[in-house]
Amino acid sequence: MTICTDIIANGYDLKTLIYNSGVVSIKVIALIICLLLATAYLTFAERKVIAYMQLRVGPSLAGPFGLLQPIADAVKLVFKEPIIPAKADRKLFIIAPIITFVLSLLGWSVIPIDHDIVLSRIHIGGILFILAVTSLGVYGIIIAGWASNSKYAFLGAVRSAAQMISYELAMALSIVAVLIVTGEMDLIQIVEAQKTRPIWLTIMMLPLAVIYFISILAKTNRLPFDLPEAESELVAGYNVEYSSMAFAMFFLGEYANMILGSSLMTIMFLGGYLPPFNLEILTFIPGYIWFILKVSMVLFCFLWIRATLPRYRYDQLMYLGLKVFLPIVLAWIIVVSAILVYSNNLP
């Protein structure tokens, strides 16, 4: 008798299955809603922060202090007419933004916001799952560039693919160093391992944290590495032909990946949901509050850099990723491993 027959034959098991499915569905819907709201208001925060840095007011007309601006933008994009170029590959043109958007949400299923707040805890492959999902996102961009039948979109897609692959190496290797230090692949255990990690070891991981952060900037196509969307060269890059909700999906996917990358940096290098320096006096504040504050701090650095730095040339971008960051990360992994063995601090 098959498993399905066993479930149907046993009424209790069927009820349990339905109940568990309902609970998981509610959690997934709640996570998606929270992520969409966070993404929408990250765009608002970006416009406000950059406006203040440039001595402007920023969005201020839609609602008090402009707080309804993201809703106004969403309504505008929903009701805009979706335009598909006559010579575009219609099916691929529509599928591309969906791929990018869905993959940007999948990584959140294993992110622990607190010790007990995680949608799906994968004990062995949480890190591998996030790396795999974020790496697949480039396929949506490549498909968009190809399907648009535009030289600007195609060049933007090629740039994006090369850029993501180049910086994926440095980012993944910086995470490997964390796995060597903690001896864990479970994201929650990685955070818990930072409770007892010596302070000198935390300081030694800071250069890798900086390289990881810069790699995330390149991976999410943010300034100073927004070469795939360089306005002065490619108009808008791979999404130049997109409008309406298709454009919104690319937009939301980019910002969702920013938040995901910041969350992973918080877990790997900043103690996740633990208080700063694991101070006992601060443990009365819930872990998810610390997690949100740390992620917000990393995201502010994204916005600060966008308002401050000019765009790199493409050759400088590739040189930095392959000839500077990659050797540094490899050398640093060797140094950290040797120190762990010498000091008898292997996990």
UniProtKB/Swiss-Prot annotation:
One of its GO terms (biological process) is aerobic respiration. Its EC number is 7.1.1.-. One of its GO terms (cellular component) is plasma membrane. It catalyses: a quinone + NADH + 5 H(+)(in) = a quinol + NAD(+) + 4 H(+)(out). It is a multi-pass membrane protein. The chain crosses the membrane at residues 22-42, 59-79, 93-113, 124-144, 171-191, 198-218, 240-260, 285-305, 321-341. GO terms for molecular function: NADH dehydrogenase activity; oxidoreductase activity, acting on NAD(P)H, quinone or similar compound as acceptor; quinone binding. It is found in: Cell inner membrane. Keywords: Cell inner membrane, Cell membrane, Membrane, NAD, Quinone, Translocase, Transmembrane, Transmembrane helix, Ubiquinone. InterPro entries: NADH_UbQ_OxRdtase_su1/FPO, NADH_UbQ_OxRdtase_su1_CS. Belongs to the complex I subunit 1 family. NDH-1 is composed of 14 different subunits. Subunits NuoA, H, J, K, L, M, N constitute the membrane sector of the complex. NDH-1 shuttles electrons from NADH, via FMN and iron-sulfur (Fe-S) centers, to quinones in the respiratory chain. The immediate electron acceptor for the enzyme in this species is believed to be ubiquinone. Couples the redox reaction to proton translocation (for every two electrons transferred, four hydrogen ions are translocated across the cytoplasmic membrane), and thus conserves the redox energy in a proton gradient. This subunit may bind ubiquinone. PANTHER family: NADH DEHYDROGENASE SUBUNIT 1, NADH-UBIQUINONE OXIDOREDUCTASE CHAIN 1. This is NADH-quinone oxidoreductase subunit H. The lineage of its organism: Bacteria, Pseudomonadati, Pseudomonadota, Alphaproteobacteria, Rickettsiales. The gene is nuoH.
